[in-house]
Amino acid sequence: MENKYEIILYGGTGFTGQLCAKYFSENYPELNWAIAGRNKKKLDEIKEKFNLKVDTLVADGDNLEALRVLAGQTKVILSTAGPFARYSDLMVQACVEQGTHYTDITGENH
């Protein structure tokens, strides 16, 4: 099955997520990506703030099934949603199950 997106940026409403969203939009205009997180209203605000021409996707970091659906739509999940000790395990599990590459920005050492 072909993925709908090349990258989904999960946690795009936070400080680092916004930097990533802005960077993608300014430097990779042909990239097929989406912005995702827990709050549709906040995602739409970021989309408007940076004039992003991308889809917004909602998935709660505590909901494995929602994360599976999210991971199943892309080649790569880039997560900027922390704390990673709380939110990364289920996302990693969803990515493994869907055959999706995963990366995050954690500096946490636990």
Task: Go through the PLM ranges and name each one.
Residues E6, K75-V76, H101:
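Structural motif
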Residues E6-N27:
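N-terminal Rossmann NAD(P)H-binding glycine-rich loop of SDR-like oxidoreductase domains
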Residues N32-A34:
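Short beta-strand element of Class I
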Residues A36-K40, D60-G61:
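N-terminal Rossmann-fold cofactor-binding loop
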Residues F50-K53, A71-V76, E97:
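Short acidic/histidine-rich motifs immediately flanking catalytic phosphotransfer sites
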Residues V58-Y87:
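Conserved Rossmann-fold cofactor-binding substructure of NAD(P)-dependent oxidoreductases
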Residues P83, V92-H110:
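ADP-ribose/adenylate-binding Rossmann-like module
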